[in-house]
From Swiss-Prot:
Protein name: DNA-directed RNA polymerase subunit omega
Leading EC class: transferase
Listed EC numbers: 2.7.7.6
Native species: Thermosynechococcus vestitus (strain NIES-2133 / IAM M-273 / BP-1)
Pfam families: RNA_pol_Rpb6
Role this protein plays: Promotes RNA polymerase assembly. Latches the N- and C-terminal regions of the beta' subunit thereby facilitating its interaction with the beta and alpha subunits.
Recorded GO MF terms: DNA binding; DNA-directed RNA polymerase activity
Family statement drawn from the similarity comment of this UniProt entry: Belongs to the RNA polymerase subunit omega family.
Record bears the keyword Transferase: yes
Length: 77
């Protein structure tokens, strides 16, 4: 059984705002978050949804906010 990770809604909001502030285009960063979440959901489709520690969108926000220090990772591929 996986350990559940808990982030407060305030922490998620802070990270999302941080992403938006560091992005030149609010729409583009929103689409990038959605695309990463969609990819993550596809990778985890075979797993039981009750065992997932975080929803894909929240995980995408957390991962991308951690990558803000490396802006080249946020660039379009």
């Amino acid at each position: 059984m996986q350990k559940r990770l808990h982030y407060s809604s305030l922490e998620i909001n802070r990270r999302a705002e941080e992403l938006i502030q560091h992005s030149a285009n609010r729409y583009r960063i929103t689409v990038q978050i959605a695309n990463r979440a969609k990819q993550r959901r596809g990778l985890e489709a075979s797993e039981d949804l009750d065992d997932l520690p975080l929803k894909p969108v929240i995980r995408a926000i957390i991962e991308m906010s951690d990558e803000v220090a490396q802006p080249e990772l946020l660039a379009d591929s």
